[in-house]
Amino acid sequence: MKKYIIILFATFTLYSCTEKSNANNLTEDKTTEGITKIYALKDYQQDFNQMIELLLKKHPQPYAFISEDSLNNLINNQYNKITDSTTMGGFLWISLEVVSAINCGHSVVWSSKLDQLPKSMLFPMNVRYVDSNLYIMDPKNNANKLSAGNEILTINGVDVKTLQKEIFQHLPSDGYNESNKQENVSVYFRYMCAMFYNFPTSFTVTVKQNGTIEKIKLKEAENLEPTKTFLDNCENNLCFDINMESNTAIITIRSFGYYGKGTIFKSFIDSCFYQIKENKIQNLIIDLRNNSGGDPFCGSYLLQHIANKPYTYFHKSIKRYSKLKKTIQPNPNGFKNKPYILINGKCFSTTGHFCSLVKENNLGIFIGNETGGTYTCNDFSKNFTLKNTNLTFRVARQICKTTATTLTNKHGIIPDHYLIPDIDNILNNTDTVLNYTLRLIEKE
């Protein structure tokens, strides 16, 4: 399924285009106009009711992970939080909790106004949660007082564990999956913070460093470019390498999103497996980490090259993908041994589908963290604009399910070797998952 970004919030769809934003480059012409605007109470109520009606009518299974009574209670509670002094940003925060409660990673409500916030309202450092502890990855303009690796204990007086729990309640994900939220909370932290703290004009943190706890008021950021890691090294999303010494090939696929460009993806896969066969490579690593999905035809084409028997991809025929309901034969040039497949919480949508079929048919060995997707998800999403506030509400409209139906829909694919890097390895940019996999190969 294809990656789709509504401003800066990653949701995914089968047939929408990938959009890019330059919001990481903060400028002085940003404004609070719109996000702090107060609409008439009746306008909020009308938009809220419009969103709920669309959610319940368009979504194929809004009660899959929450009972009808529980969802109705939440809807009523959130509706009652709306007052005549609620800002548009506050209304968005209220609405997000309802949409996130159905546990569908392809459904979200968002606003382009968040992309226009002044830098004073955006948390000015790159951070990452490891479990429930929050660490600085890049202090940006605060490097004179803070360092990467310092642990943040509170932000504007709120414990970071409480903050994480609140943000999780407003982040969409599939089922009861938290690995996907754990990854995305770092990506969207500054926007979630802005909403949670009701768009503050400054941030003060208490930080543990050098054995002491300090309270520090943060400087604004000039830019908020994400912290680069080894996972960003595959610039074109498709990379291949052979290590002849260990007789190991590594195929890196950061996206399946080759809609209308399937020949590019197929040529890459054909080339990889041709070289593997020509060089008589016995060990294969397929790195799918941070692959948030894309075209199901791409997922199936990769699967053909590691399958050892015919398979059917989709459980039911799906518009535009009816061929994937038919029996698909393994590729004669495919890999004959079991590959090692590297996964994490950002493996979503089509990547979850691919992994589910590998798991169901025992075609590979998974290493890393639970995937963000599984054998089923909801997609064919459509954007709707709320009448008064102009918030964008994106709702999934169809169930997309592979034939790996013995798996649970509540969680992602669980790795055979569960491995999550600790803060030291993250700070040192050490690829512990790949290194662990290479050691496994050496022991064989």
Segments from the language model and where they lie:
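Positively charged n-region of N-terminal signal peptides that target proteins for export
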Residues: 1-4, 18-20
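Sec-dependent N-terminal signal peptides
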Residues: 4-13
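Flexible, low-complexity junctional segments that flank or bridge functional domains
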Residues: 18-283, 290-292, 297, 312-314, ...
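Active-site-proximal beta-strand/loop segments in catalytic clefts of secreted hydrolases
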Residues: 139, 252-256, 287-291, 317-318, ...
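Gly/Ser/Thr-rich loop/hinge elements
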Residues: 293-338, 342, 346, 376, ...
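Extended C-terminal subregions enriched in glycine
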Residues: 338-360, 365-373
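C-terminal soluble interaction/assembly domains
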Residues: 359, 366-386, 395, 402
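Low-complexity, Gly/Ser/Thr/Pro-rich intrinsically disordered linker/tail segments
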Residues: 409, 413-444
